[in-house]
Amino acid sequence: MPGMKRTMSSECLLPYYTAHSYRSMGVFNTSMGNLQRQLYKGGEYDIFKYAPMFESDFIQISKRGEVIDVHNRVRMVTVCIASTSPVLPLPDVMLLARPAKVCEEHARRARFIKGKGCKPSKTLELTRLLPLKFVKISVHDHEKQQLRLKLATGRTFYLQLCPSSDAREDLFCYWEKLVYLLRPPMTNCISNSTLPTGETSVDTKSTLVSEIRGEGDQNSRPQSSPTVSEATSAAFAGGERTQPAAAAAVTPVSAKARAAGTAGAAAGTAGAAAGTAGPAAGPAAGTAGPAAGTAGAAAGTAGAAAGTAGATAGTAGATAGMAGATAGTAAETAGTAAETAGAARAAGGPMAAAVAAPSAGMTKAETATSPTSGVISLAATTTKPPGSGQVAAAMIGSAAKDQVGGESSKAMALAANITLENVDVALAGAANSISESPPAGGDASGSPDTGLNVAFAGSIKTKSPAEDKPEAPLVSTLQSEGYMCERDGSQKVSQTSSEAKEKRERREKDRTSSRKSSHHRRTGMSRHSSKDKSRKTSSYRSVSGKTREDKGKGHGRLRGKRHSSSHKSESRTGHKTRKNRSPAGLGSVSKRATKITSFFRSFLVRPTPKAGDTSCDRGGVDIVTKLVEKKQDIEAVMEKSKDSEFKDTVISETMEKIILETKSI
């Protein structure tokens, strides 16, 4: 009897004893449930004999809240949350049990003793033992007292609380509290997992794994978990498991990894610094202008050019940012140096100086920080006196050097703009260099690890001499305005009355000579072969067509060296015949052929500066297009014999289009 009393007392005090000094004592400080009592008496699972447990009965439902019937019976399930060892701060195992099948004999026996008040004892069958690191418990519906269980395989179950008649009313509130303990908010999760202590360390199975697994239903695809290899819990190790380590350990990041992440931002900062130094050089040059005397205006112009170079440097900085992001070198040190320079400027550390030289027209502005920061900024503009030509140069630069431990870095940004008489050059670049010395414990012969990142952008604009000169007149206007085009160029001569008389006389002579030559050519047409006819007819037709157009307009083409060649032609055409003339265009061609002219050439250049200017404003692609037209009219006279003459007119027209294209990097 004493032993029986001791057993009953220990059995009743079992939950209180195991939940003493437990973190969730308020939840587990309850009386024994059916499953816990069965595990305590059965002895099959000694690990759960004195383990604190919290259990309740549920019915399985669908996601919509409908009851799932199996063989016209409600499917009951007992859910138990247990801890395999009192040392653990939180429970780590979930047990699932269902009512066991009653034997037929036991059922028959129950029919006979139905009215006598003797009921068969209800037994449970333990079906599942799941570590809580692979289960995510959440509240599905608070009003209907429904829970949601999601396993690591992706399957999801919905359970509705089905308490007994003698259960407490706030039973579901305890389940909500337990869910909160197992799945704390994200802030608590981070603070508990990253800063574990001996008393309040949180097992990572219930914090981080839940964030890795997604939401899904029963048919969702199984999702892998990084902790699947740790499926064995304290339940299988007899509760003798060491405390878990931190959820996320902070690993040291090398300088190269940090540089790869911030290379774009650092290069952009260098470009912005160069752009800021560019406009600053403009006011400095303007201030030094009055002191420079005659070079003051040129210095102001150079200051504006420096501002333009600064804007170009900003564009180059963006390009350098993209190049730096892909290079993955130590550009982060350049950003650190830029921040140090900004702090030094805010503290009043940097020193500024401006120097002006009146004779050379040079303005220089420097900014240097304290020796500890190692940041230097430079802006300079240089112009030559007006008598020596239009030459202007502007340069903006910034250099930084930093050394932290065994790492040393150098960063430099430079922008320059040079303007000459016919060439305008804008350059911008950024360079970053980092070197890491080998560790002290490493090999002494190892060379330091160095990295270099360079970004460069530039544009060149060439001004052709034709832009300064007036545009040459068109060929159609040369005749009326009296232009004489030679190989060297074109010049305008005044038409006098004597020249007009000479032209009239020449026209009359040409008409008379053409009539005579046409008569002789008709008599000599039978001497030529059919092959020569087919070969010459096309060229003669083209010449005759142009002659008609010129005659219809009333303008005759002017050609040099007319006097000497005209008399020779008149003396010869009377005795020689014409070859290969078609009957249709014979009369007009003969009139045209008798006009003997010299070489005519027109070289016309039409630049399109608008396309180049707009591209320069964009800072992208500079395109200079030149259209070159070459028209050559050649009339040659060749003598073969005394009785025959070969005369032909060759007209060649060539069009050349030259495109100079420069693309920025």
UniProtKB/Swiss-Prot annotation:
Q: Which InterPro entries match?
A: GARIL-like_Rab2B-bd
Write out the biased-composition intervals (Polar residues).
219-232
Tissue specificity is: Expressed in adult spermatocytes and spermatids.
Which residue stretches does the UniProt record annotate as biased composition, category Basic residues?
514-538, 554-566
Q: Taxonomically, which superkingdom?
A: Eukaryota
Annotated compartments: Golgi apparatus; Nucleus, Cajal body
Biological processes per GO annotation: acrosome assembly; binding of sperm to zona pellucida; cell morphogenesis; flagellated sperm motility; penetration of zona pellucida; single fertilization; spermatid development
* Keyword Phosphoprotein (UniProt): yes
The answer to whether UniProt assigns keyword Cell inner membrane to this entry is no
Sorted alphabetically, the keyword list is: Golgi apparatus, Nucleus, Phosphoprotein
An example Gene Ontology CC term for this record: Golgi apparatus
The family database entries (Pfam families) matched by this protein are listed as: GARIL_Rab2_bd
**How does this protein assemble?**
Interacts (via N-terminus) with RAB2B (in GTP-bound form). Interacts with FRG1.
Q: What does this protein do?
A: May be involved in RNA biogenesis.
What name has this protein been given in UniProt?
A: Golgi-associated RAB2B interactor protein 3
Taxonomic classification: Eukaryota, Metazoa, Chordata, Craniata, Vertebrata
